[in-house]
Every structure is written in C-alpha cells, then in structure tokens.
Amino acid sequence: MHEWALADAIVRTVLEHAQKENASKVLAVKVVLGELQDVDAKIVEFAMNELFKGTIAEGAEIIFEEEEAVFKCRNCGYEWRLSEVREKLDERMREDIHFIPEVVHAFLSCPRCGSHDFEVVKGRGVYIAGIKIEKEGEQ
C-alpha cells in the first residue's frame, strides 16, 4: 500500500508540472528510488500507469533509477554502504526502515567504531529526477 501512496504523489506532481508548463503530453518520467526506502519499483510502476490512465501522461515511459544508500559516521568519519551491512538486517527491520527510514539508526551502527551517530549521505527517499513533456505543436 505504501507504494501506491508514493505513486499517487509522483503522479500528482507530474501532472501539476505538466499543467504549469502547458504540456500537451507527458512523454517520460524518471524516478529515483533510494535503496534505504526499499520500494518495489514494479508496484510503483503499475500504480503510476493505472493513475496516468485518462490523463496527458497515459502511456508515458517510466524510468526508475536506484540510488545506493551511503552512510557517514559523525564520530569517526567512516563512510559505508548499506550493501556492506545488509546481512545484519532481518525482514522485520527492513520493513520498519521501509516505512520510517529514520529508524535505521536503531538497527545499524558504524562498522568501524560502533557509533549510532551517523548520517544518511544518499539513498534515502523517492524523488522525481526528470519529466519529459511535449507542448502543442512540438515534436
């Protein structure tokens, strides 16, 4: 259900942007999915296609890019990737992070010094990286 809510927000944003730009058609949408969010791109794509039906975005190409999650320890400065520590997360933890990414601090610590005081450098959240539109008379 979380993916449908994300898809709805993306679709509303795309259509608002298209309207502001006086677009006659939305040709493509590029969406970046942060690895930490653990979003199912297939569900988001299906939901977006359903929500685009009957709009100027119907049939638009949907492109997904996954952004790798990277963390930086505020204590020792060490940077690491989620892929390096993923095995420490069980299914329940991954689901908790999926809904509330900030809880990652409760489940992970710096591999070098053990501190839970780290920042998410990238790979968190979902955002629109690009919208390709067509205006009346353009091709």
From Swiss-Prot:
Question: Which NCBIfam families does the UniProt record give?
Answer: PRK03824.1
Q: Which family does it belong to?
A: Belongs to the HypA/HybF family.
Q: What does the protein in this record do?
A: Involved in the maturation of [NiFe] hydrogenases. Required for nickel insertion into the metal center of the hydrogenase.
Q: Which UniProt keywords apply?
A: Metal-binding, Nickel, Zinc
Tell me which residues bind Ni(2+).
2
- Which GO terms label this protein's molecular function in UniProt? nickel cation binding; zinc ion binding
**Residues annotated as binding Zn(2+):** 73, 76, 110, 113
Which BP terms in the Gene Ontology apply to this protein? protein maturation; protein modification process
Name listed for the protein in its UniProt record: Hydrogenase maturation factor HypA
Going by the entry's taxonomy, the superkingdom of the source organism is recorded as Archaea
Output the InterPro entries linked to this UniProt entry: Hydgase_Ni_incorp_HypA/HybF_CS, HypA/HybF
